[in-house]
Amino acid sequence: YRSVFRDDLFAGKTLIVTGGGSGIGRCTAHELAALGARVVLLGRKEDKLKAVADEIREDTGREALFFTCDIRDEDKVRDTVAAIYKQVQQVDGLVNNAGGQFPSPVAMISQKGWETVIRTNLTGGFLMAREVFMQGMNKSGGSIVNIVADMWGGMPGMGHSGAARAGMDNFTKTAALEWACAGVRVNAVAPGWIASSGMDTYPEGM
């Protein structure tokens, strides 16, 4: 395995990856650790987080921490970010990767299903970014990367996710302008369709 990035690019940096127990988050955490970062994994399932942390330690010999957290829960997010800062003192970056959705035409999405996807893909990312900023980055600076989706022309079959990701794109632009004076960069990345474990729940052929 050889990265396209410079060796030790993130040496001495502490980076949080939400949704770090599987899929894109897991791969992102491995890449960041391989480039020298100390990664902090967040997710809802402790067994998955522990497995990825163990993989990273074995592959890189570097420290990997993990915390269970439902990013849709404001109090839990606040407390988890506080616990992270207590352990690592400074957070240099946040990858807002956690998300989830289910395939459905717009007409068949219930209010509960709609609100669940919005809370996961928009509200959760906002809460994480806000708390990381307010609890440390407003003083130390840093970088926030929000993982979105290729929703620019609409997302047929995924209207709830497209709406949430479009909201996250606008939030990204607003936060970038408001937090630039604190030395915080905020960007969004739309990786497109990735054949990760997240697609295991989708119907065949989608």
Regions found by a protein language model. Give the residues of each.
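Conserved glycine-rich cofactor-binding loop
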Residues: 14, 21-22
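Active-site loop of short-chain dehydrogenase/reductase
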Residues: 13, 62-63, 90-91, 136-150, ...
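Substrate-binding pocket helix/loop in short-chain dehydrogenase/reductase
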Residues: 105-106, 110-118, 199
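Conserved glycine-rich Rossmann-like NAD(P)H-binding loop of the short-chain dehydrogenase/reductase
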Residues: 37-51
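A short, exposed helix-loop element centered on a Lys and neighboring polar residues
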Residues: 129-130, 173
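A glycine/serine/threonine-rich, flexible loop-to-helix segment
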Residues: 181, 192-206
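Catalytic loop of short-chain dehydrogenase/reductase
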Residues: 145-167, 172-181, 193-194
